[in-house]
Amino acid sequence: MYKTKGGFQLTLQTLSLVVGFMAWSIIAPLMPFIKQDVNVTEGQISIILAIPVILGSVLRVPFGYLTNIVGAKWVFFTSFIVLLFPIFFLSQAQTPGMLMASGFFLGVGGAIFSVGVTSVPKYFPKEKVGLANGIYGMGNIGTAVSSFLAPPIAGIIGWQTTVRSYLIIIALFALIMFIFGDTQERKIKVPLMAQMKTLSKNYKLYYLSYWYFITFGAFVAFGIFLPNYLVNHFGIDKVDAGIRSGVFIALATFLRPIGGILGDKFNAVKVLMIDFVIMIIGAVILGISDHIALFTVGCLTISICAGIGNGLIFKLVPSYFSNEAGSANGIVSMMGGLGGFFPPLVITYVANLTGSSHLAFIFLAVFGCIALFTMRHLYQKEYGSLKHS
């Protein structure tokens, strides 16, 4: 019975995450269409694309905590109701300010990530948590759904009507969660400040947050900037750019459970070190690529490593912070979201300063190298020599 309930709630919450991420990411794939109707500069575009990440990151901490207090059902339901307003406002946007305001509150769709990673592990034994969280993380595919479907639909019915169609989906899932959400979910009522005090003293939280800042940050950042970047720098058609961006997102999403499985079967930190070495290579490839073929190889390498890395990290979070899982999940996932905020701005700034975005990708490789040192430190403190696992 409990196993059946766990499977059902995992499915329900994963689909809810799909819908949340569809809303969170709707602006990026439609930007090539939006900028034809709204007068925006390239600098404004980079800010508009990055803004949804702010609230989508910061709210992950209270959302994770509230999930332990009231349960996933009510956090999901309330989030969907709130999302109806910025989606409608976006469909009416006529100025950069309106785009920024609606994008900011669309961040609620990204914040719900911490709801499931806090709730789902309650339904599964410890040895299955990595896989369960990996499956839930596949809800990130919502970003790819918007990338794949929004541009061709917008080409037929217009971007405003495309955005308004999301109102139906969001309202439907609010109703589904209200009816089928689990009111009997186990609650964990540890005072927030007590959790924060405990977490602040644990260096593992800082390491995991930094690693997720890179892996999930890369996932979010590439999903945000790729559609517009491919159109501007390689002259790719708007719909084709959306599809290519969707492939990046889908690949990372489907590989996330693989990361969870690897974390369940092997030492997650050791596997993560291998993953980051390959990611660094991918970043270097992007840093030297001037042709679309080489750029594609670099992007796919980053996509694979980001997806597997995301799954590995969220295998480790509940293992290290069982009593403070909600807050720890929120903090780590918040840092991952913020990791997606800065790269589009940095890429635009570096491109304006140097005439090329190559240096920005090299920064990713440098951040990855620093992460490797922290992983080695954690591994040696937890398990001893790297020669033994």
Curated annotation (Swiss-Prot):
Main location: membrane
GO BP annotation list: nitrate assimilation
Transmembrane segments: 14-34, 45-65, 69-89, 97-117, 139-159, 161-181, 211-231, 246-266, 268-288, 294-314, 331-351, 353-373
Pfam families: MFS_1
Origin: domain of life: Bacteria
InterPro entries in the record: MFS, MFS_dom, MFS_trans_sf, NO3_transporter
GO cellular component: plasma membrane
Induction (record text): Positively regulated by the two-component system NreB/NreC.
Matching PROSITE patterns: MFS
Record's bilayer topology term: Multi-pass membrane protein
Family label: Belongs to the major facilitator superfamily. Nitrate/nitrite porter (TC 2.A.1.8) family.
Biological function: Probably required for nitrate uptake under anoxic conditions. Also possibly involved in excretion of nitrite produced by the dissimilatory reduction of nitrate.
PANTHER family: HIGH-AFFINITY NITRATE TRANSPORTER 2.3
Protein name according to UniProt: Probable nitrate transporter NarT
Organism of derivation: Staphylococcus aureus (strain JH9)
Gene that encodes it: narT
